[in-house]
């Protein structure tokens, strides 16, 4: 394979990687603009959790936080 083709493949791969990373950051910003809380952030009846995560509260309802779903935890465990 010629060096020009290798350079082109490298550049296309780098652009793809950067675009995927930018898309992740954009989706995080969109969720915060919608007014939802991410994983392990505070939540309430007026501030819901993003991505359908459950809002888990202490026994006296004073410390509510969004928890990751079992699917997310399972996925993270096997991605390591």
From Swiss-Prot:
Disulfide bonding pattern of the chain: 36-50, 43-55, 49-66, 57-64
Propeptide segments, given as residue ranges: 23-34
Record InterPro entries: Spidertoxin
SUPFAM superfamilies: omega toxin-like (SSF57059)
Main localization, broad class: secreted
Record-linked Gene3D superfamilies: 4.10.40.10
Tissue expression notes: Expressed by the venom gland.
Signal peptide: 1-22
Pfam families assigned to the protein according to its UniProt record, in alphabetical order: Toxin_9
Stretches of the chain forming a coiled coil according to its record: none
Example of a GO cellular component annotation carried by this entry: extracellular region
Free-text note regarding domains: The presence of a 'disulfide through disulfide knot' structurally defines this protein as a knottin.
Protein name from the UniProt record: U19-lycotoxin-Ls1a
